[in-house]
Amino acid sequence: YNEYLGTVPLEVTCSNSHVGQENIRFTPSSIKITMEDKVEESFGIAATTNGKTEKGYELGNVKILNGDTVKVAGPQSLIRIISKITVPVDITGMSESSVAPYPIRIEDKNGAVLSDIQKDKLEIKDNSGIFLQDHMATVSTNIWKLYNDIPLEVKCVGNPAPGYRISGITITPKSVNLAAEEAVYEELEGKLVLNDTISIEGITTSEDITLDVNDTLNLYSGVRLEADT
């Protein structure tokens, strides 16, 4: 390596013993290379989704099983321009959950996607130091089924004032549409009993009370209101 010129001389040999080195000519006789420091930095990584699931289903959640950070090593000039690392997942037509590898997408600070040639200069490892072969990350995609017209129920405690009685309780809306894992839906037993308890102790007039359905849904893992609700 000629440090002054930044070139490496080329040498060509011939396996035919009848051909002497003096008879071999080639061009160019050297190649110019650029050397720079190799550095490593940690970056956050997140899964993104595009497309729509099959009718009657909804995306529950998506998670990169390799962790939410990666270590990227490579030429300093290339590492410095990295701005965003994601794993795009196409959920078009999906009706079942899956665990599968997906290509890692790297964007520079101008929002441009790094080319395959640029990515080939990089080494990507998870936070444990395990290399992500072929720049692929393993993603868990959970698809939930939609359940329509799930009736709402509330619990009341206490008694109205003497001389009064409860003629009825009206819930508006009467039902909701839920996206849920099958096991969670079975746990609900076909209805959603709101966690908030309504006290009717000593009341003498009709009352309007507002309850947040999400306060109850948040007690479960794997269920939420339908996205369009």
Go through each PLM region and give its residues.
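Structured interface patches
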Residues: Y1-T229
